Every structure is written in C-alpha cells, then in structure tokens.
Amino acid sequence: MRIQVNNEIEINYELTGDPKTQPVIALTHGMGGSQANWEADIPQLSEKYAVLRWDVRGHGDSDKPDAPYSAEIHARDLAGLLEALNINQVYCGGNSMGGAITQRFMLDFPHLAKAGFLMCTSSQVNPKMAGAWEQRATIAETEGMEAMTAAQSTFANANT
C-alpha cells in the first residue's frame, strides 16, 4: 500500500495487525532491499505486535526521487509515515542501512521511539568503506537485485 508522507513523496508500506490494540514495531530494511525482506519475521512478531514494514525512499515500490538520499531524510520519511498512519510511538529496528536509519530516527524523533534494535549496522560509514557502499548502490541501481543477490550469496546463510 502507498501513502503520501511529508507532502513530498509516496512511501510503500505493509501494516500487519492493529496499531490501536497492539504496540507497533517498525522495521527498516537495508540498502537495495525492500519491506519484503522482513516477510519471514511477520508470523512470530505479529503474535504480539502490529508490524509496520516500509520501502525506504528509492527502494521497492516507494517513490524514487532524483535527489541525494541520507539517513536524515529517511528518518524524516519514517516519522512522516507514522504521522500519516496516526501512529504515535513505535519500537523500531533495522538491519544494515536500515539500522543507520533507525539510529537517526531515534536521535531526531525520540518522542516517537519507545526502543530500538539494530542488526549488522554502524553509526557511520568508515571513509575506507565509502567506495564499497557507493559500488553496492550503483550495482543495485543499474543491475538490479539479481546482481545484489549473487554478490550476497557468497555469505553464509544465517538460517542454516
């Protein structure tokens, strides 16, 4: 489902459960991913939480404006999404780039964050690694997710 946030862009999201009767957990994916990355986690999380997954600006089915992106912009998008959905506070978490966005969100919008969790992330990009991140972003943009999947398949499967 898509919704306009901050009078600026449309964000794609999925909301499982009832945010009026359950605490909400907001999940933010990593670079080149989408809200679908959290699909396997939904059955267990939705037993206790309303689960909000969203496609970060420039990813999945969200708008892809032709402008620079930053953790600050993505954090503002999440705050705008919560406002548009009339959600006052969330537990929030993210992996990789999503973890960096989650940290920025918690710093910039502490009144919206009850608590957070971070996976495989950092608070800043090491200057030596900046080129590698740019390369990953370019591959995702020009060659698509199949190329990203091929590169990531060299890592161990955490579910085995």
Name what the model sees in each region.
Residues 1-10:
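N-terminal cap/lid segment of alpha/beta-hydrolase-fold proteins
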Residues 9-67:
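Conserved HGGG/HGGXW glycine-rich cap/lid loop of the alpha/beta-hydrolase fold
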Residues 29-31, 90, 94-99:
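Conserved alpha/beta-hydrolase "nucleophile elbow" surrounding the catalytic nucleophile
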Residues 41, 74-77, 148:
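Hydrophobic alpha-helical packing elements
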Residues 52-54, 95, 119:
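The conserved SAM/SAH-binding core of class I Rossmann-like methyltransferase domains
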Residues 55, 91, 114-117:
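Residue in the alpha/beta-hydrolase core beta-strand immediately N-terminal to the catalytic nucleophile
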Residues 72-90:
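Conserved acidic catalytic loop of the alpha/beta-hydrolase fold
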Residues 100-108, 112-143, 147:
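Flexible "cap/lid" loop of the alpha/beta hydrolase fold
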